Amino acid sequence: MPRRTDLHRILVIGSGPILIGQAAEFDYAGTQACLALKEEGYEVILVNSNPATIMTDRDVADKVYIEPITLEFVSSILRRERPDAIVPTLGGQTGLNMATELAKSGIPDELGIELLGTKLSAIEKAEDRDLFKQLMDELGQPVPASEVVHTVDEAVKVGNTIGYPLIVRPAYTLGGTGGGMCCDEAELVRIVGKGLELSPVTECLIEQSIAGFKEIEYEMMRDGADNTMVVCTMENFDPVGVHTGDSIVFAPTQTLTDVEHEMLRDASIEIVRTLGIEGGCNVQLALDPNSFQYYVIEVNPRVSRSSALASKATGYPIAKIAAKIAVGLTLDEIRNPVTGTTWSMFEPMLDYVVAKIPRWPFDKFAQADRRLGTQMKATGEVMALGRTIEESLLKAVRSLEIGVDHLALREVADLPDDILEERLLHARDDRLFCLTEAIRRGRTVQELHEQTRIDVFFLDKVAHILEIEERLRACPDDSEALWIAKRNGFSDPAIARIWGETPDDVRVRRVDNGIVPVYKMVDTCAGEFESSTPYFYSTYEMENESKKSQRPSVLVLGSGPIRIGQGIEFDYATVHSVKAIQAAGYEAIIMNSNPETVSTDFSISDKLYFEPLTFEDVMNVIDLEQPDGVIVQFGGQTAINLAGPLSAAGVPILGTQVADLDRAEDREGFESLLAELGIPQAPGGTARSSEEAFAVAEELGYPVLVRPSYVIGGRAMAIVTSAEELKRYMRDAVHASPDKPVLVDRYLNGLECEVDAICDGTDVLIPGIMEHIERAGVHSGDSMAVYPPQRMSQQVADRIIEVTTKLARGLKTKGILNIQFVVANDPATGEETVYVIEANPRASRTVPFLSKVTGVSMAEVATRIILGETLADLGLRPGLLPFSKRIHVKSPVFSFSKLDLVDSHLGPEMKSTGEVMGSDDTVEKALYKVFEAANLHVPEYGKILITVTDDAKPEALQLARRFDRIGFQLVGTMGTARFFDEGGLRIDVAEKIGSGEAGSTESVLDLISRNGCDAVINVMGNGQDTIIDGKQIRREAIARGIPLFTSLDTAAAICRVMESRVFSTESI
């Protein structure tokens, strides 16, 4: 069928902020879809609340709305734009839920708007657990015994009928949110209670556990003419019981027989056809390893996390094809963009193995529950390609950027046998390393299979890696052993450790022996058809398929896996840098390891190398490509950390030079530069031992801010208020040493703000100044930022411009620079002073936001500067650009509901996973939008629980008066209530945790657990009891989905919004 000509304007719904379970893969999918629809001649309207995405750039859609994805705002856009159709299947769970909500509201029918792609009835059959079970029963497709429940009592009855263990799956939630495995009634009651609250339809499926079965995924594609195909098959390393987003995954499937594959393929095709899917669809199945019994676990009737992985694994652009199917085209009418010669109905063939490993946030959250189950916890993932499982697995391990380049983790190697056994029984993020260590200690593959239910085939591959280790030990300096190790994915540093040499020694030996990688093309057809895809992976074979271009080229290093502190913002900057490189006439080469991102779409760059971002792997590409230089400014700390080794190896680093990058990171060097330039900074010092840290803190006076150097996202940063706290920090959080110093600063309590600037070595452009709502002490990535500044005096703004210009020149910046300031009173003079907190001579996470609100594509301008142009050449004047008339607010978004035991209190260590943006004519309206977009819905009335420290009580009293004035009922613990009462404000009392007696006042936890309040304001204290109580309060509020504020500044911002939305009622 030809494309539909009765449609002209199409609305695409994005997926909103990055959350655990819904990450950058939807920016990749949405960008592909918008461009595909524009390619077909349609006018595309986009709504998304995430400014850090490529899809919200002005040139991706014809009209871009960065607005909350809520019924209120999407309805308003629909009424204003009157599109002919909506595509909801490219925005993840957010898009599907929005489509369902819109349909129930009747607005699409009222306006005559059609839902494109998979129909709403099919979405409901796949997403509604009861309807899905009924459909599978009708098809004769086996599903685990299950019942849908809407109350805890119903769940208990079902549990008694089906028997334990059970799996709880809440309806219409993301990444298994609220679900889990239950071994007894107590666990069932707890998990179902949470799941019902988090399900937007208050519904859970209670399902017979099939933990231990193989988990298989089929990524499917179907068009309106019923052409149905398998794009990719994937097999989880972990058996059923671990969420697929938290499992190591291989593509294609590795352990299925032809009979098993055909059986599951037929089942997937039948399901997709019966549902009437039009576009992409993911089918998850469980297979009994000892029989042909299988069960259908679930179907995702949309582009998903697995779709992005399948796209990058095969080269087949699923979202692009799905978008074209949505407007009527069929698979035999859509040309495969990879080969350019075949049609999209040909199923991709792989002559390589793909490995995906999740990237978890537990390096940031040491206190988190690291056990894996049916609720996803990973923030991102890496992918690696190789000719064997061993090669792709080891390449993926070193892509994780966790300080490990092989199957050896020191903390696991040091575990006692009993603890290691415990970790083998209960899957954790370090399971792969635990399995390896168990084999090292003499456990057999069969024993481990019986204990973990992981297939013997995969365990054999791990054992084979250890056999190669032993051969290397037995044959030091043997070129044949070296060749075998490299073919199976061993890194130079791993081999060097085994041989007792340096990585350089190994590198020289293998190059001298002709042991160098070749690069193979990803072409979707295993070489069967001619292809010229510029998408490559390395392996150790004979024929090289990547040829050096004759044009001058530049290599851009990506930012690797998404994790807290280094998210999609850096991929945004990478993509824009590539655009500028191409516009300047160079060939742009990208190297990255993240399958979720736009940067690893092979159509973005002239060449894509899907490789680990390590010195060895980067040098291998440089040896082949001989680029004119490497750009490291847009790949976050990942790329910055590679600048020094690459420069030492003679590689030209373009832009700001390594010595100046180091000077910004090195505390003493940076201090001396600021002193030389006459720029104030917080008094502080550098400690290379615990004793030095105590001495510096004693001299400065508490509180102090302590942090390691060379980190991103405020990792291991803390505000310390006493010597006892500092002792605990030095013991638990960091290990100070001469080469890893700890920085100790006086904590300055004031207004925090930041700038992103571009410098050509002489002139400095400052697109904008951002002002934080939360005062200093909350990490900038966790603070709400406002542009233009609202509380800043002109004198302070002028001083910031002056300091930024001085510092950019002082650091000899060529490219981009981020500087963070705190405006506070000088302790000695009492004068308002602008202090520099830190300077980062690289792109920051605010670049996408500031680029969008100022209209300056900062990464593109900075790249042109890096390549040798000046601001004057580009027609840009130095100094601060005029402020916009509209107010723009950027707000962090958190995933605490997915991370049990992680404290939601905000401080100097970053915890947010994503961001949203709101723009309007007033601050109050912009704030309202970001609160709605962040799912912190602003109530019009209700009860607010306030529990704060003694030093925060005076400020909290003033805030409480404002809430009281607009009609909110207030409740607090005894101490807070007494203080408020003395200040003339009566509030209800809730007992502190553990102090209530039978018949006494309700406790704080009871109040929260019965949803007896509509918001919680909890400011943490330093006493041990207060810390424990505060954690329990915050954890319960998160579990109940109650808006939680741990900063009075954020609470004051939401109060300001509420005040703007109500009429005052005062007696005369």
Swiss-Prot record:
Q: Which Pfam families match?
A: CPSase_L_D2, CPSase_L_D3, MGS
Show the NCBIfam families listed in the entry.
CPSaseII_lrg, PRK05294.1, PRK12815.1
Annotated source species: Cutibacterium acnes (strain DSM 16379 / KPA171202) (Propionibacterium acnes)
Q: Which residues bind Mn(2+) 1?
A: 284, 298
* UniProt binding sites for Mn(2+) 2: 298, 300
Q: What is known of its domains?
A: The large subunit is composed of 2 ATP-grasp domains that are involved in binding the 2 ATP molecules needed for carbamoyl phosphate synthesis. The N-terminal ATP-grasp domain (referred to as the carboxyphosphate synthetic component) catalyzes the ATP-dependent phosphorylation of hydrogencarbonate to carboxyphosphate and the subsequent nucleophilic attack by ammonia to form a carbamate intermediate.
Q: What is this protein called?
A: Carbamoyl phosphate synthase large chain
Q: Which residues form the MGS-like domain?
A: 936-1068
| Residues reported in the UniProt entry to bind Mg(2+) 3 | 820, 838
EC class (word): ligase
Record note on cofactor = Binds 4 Mg(2+) or Mn(2+) ions per subunit.
Q: Gene encoding this chain?
A: carB
